[in-house]
Amino acid sequence: MAKQYYQGETFDNVAPDFLHDAEFNDCTFINCRWNGARITACSFLGCTFDRCAWSDVVFSFCQMSDAWLLHCAFRSIAWGGLQGRSALVQPFGRAEQCEFRYNEFSGMALKQFDFSKCSFGDCVFDDC
């Protein structure tokens, strides 16, 4: 199956079990519930996630850059499956009013990122 491309689209209440080989550019995800979803070979470039709840999501060979996370809840997410993480290409552009529980951000070079409007519980930030 060929790679799917989405530009400027809005996805409301999407709850995939598996998402593979898709590129999302400047898309908006609203009220999306990703519970145990497996996300492979996908790109999220300049996307906004608003009032989304993710739990046990696994990223493999994925890329995220300049994503806005607004009023979201993330539980048990290992963000390490995102490729292209560096001081120059940040996965997150903004995070406001988000709750992170049991997340792992290891090796993501997030020292300059402002998470001050978010809450955290039992998260790991090794080598950030």
Name every feature range the model reports, one short phrase each.
Residues 1-128:
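Tandem repeat scaffolds
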